[in-house]
Amino acid sequence: LPLPPHPGHPGYINFSYEVLTPLKXYQSI
């Protein structure tokens, strides 16, 4: 199984925006 992106991984920022940001939006509803 692929490991989750590390904080130093280039894709970590994209992962945060695509996952954490939508979660915040859903919580505000």
UniProtKB/Swiss-Prot annotation:
Source organism of this protein record: Oryctolagus cuniculus (Rabbit)
Function: Tooth enamel proteins are produced in ameloblasts and play a role in biomineralization.
Cellular localisation: Secreted, Extracellular space, Extracellular matrix
InterPro entries, per the entry: Amelogenin
Family note: Belongs to the amelogenin family.
Residue positions, PTM Phosphoserine: 16
One annotated GO molecular function: structural constituent of tooth enamel
Name by which UniProt lists this protein: Amelogenin-like protein
Name of the gene encoding the protein in the UniProt record: AMEL
One Pfam family linked to the record: Amelogenin
Any one of the GO CC terms: extracellular region
Keywords: Biomineralization, Extracellular matrix, Phosphoprotein, Secreted
One BP term from GO: enamel mineralization
Remaining remarks: This protein sequence was found in 70 kDa-, 20 kDa- and 18 kDa-rabbit teeth enamel proteins.
KW Phosphoprotein (keyword) present: yes
